[in-house]
A protein has these predicted regions:
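Basic, polyanion-binding surface patches
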Residues: 1-167
Length: 167
């Protein structure tokens, strides 16, 4: 059965569903850092602890991260809009140029952790499954950290980034 709508309509309607915003970071085969903004990060399982996300198949950033053994999902705060867009656009000057001027650290497994992130979820890559023009990346959580004092979480809603505060 063929869909009776185009991709613009699909995106517009699904934009009514708020999604969290993370920057998935990793290192390529040479150890150079890379990152990509993701709005499709999900919890998959508590036992074992699994998470997932859906990068676009054409993403150069994901192709660099996929060369490594893992990734770190950096949960952004509503104050980190610049970081959101920095990692959403194709970088000028190479993949690691996105990290220029950032005081980032390394997770226990060596993945980049962005400064001021609300949480960092350090994972090994379990599997990558094709899903249309995207892939589903399943990660096993190895380490977790949260910074409760940095602010409200960033969400993407109806084409814009905003924040959400716990009730």
């Amino acid at each position: 059965m063929e869909a009776n709508f185009d991709s613009a309509k699909f995106r517009q309607v699904l934009g009514h569903l708020p999604t969290g915003v993370v920057v998935v970071t990793g290192v390529d085969a040479t150890g150079a850092p890379s990152g990509i903004t993701i709005g499709s990060f999900v919890s998959v399982s508590l036992n074992p602890p699994l998470v997932g996300f859906f990068p676009g198949n054409a993403s150069r950033s994901w192709s660099h991260i996929a060369q490594g053994q893992g990734f770190c999902a950096n949960v952004l705060t509503s104050e980190q809009e610049e970081l959101c867009w920095r990692f959403a656009r194709e970088p000028e000057g190479g993949m690691s140029a996105r990290f220029d001027g950032l005081d980032w650290t390394k997770s226990p497994s060596g993945m980049p952790v962005l400064p001021g992130a609300l949480a960092a979820i350090d994972c090994s890559i379990e599997s990558v499954t094709p899903a249309g023009d995207h892939s589903f990346v399943l990660g096993r959580v190895q380490h977790l950290s949260a910074n409760e004092s940095v602010g409200e979480a960033m969400v993407f809603y109806r084409g814009k980034v905003t924040g959400v505060t716990p009730a």
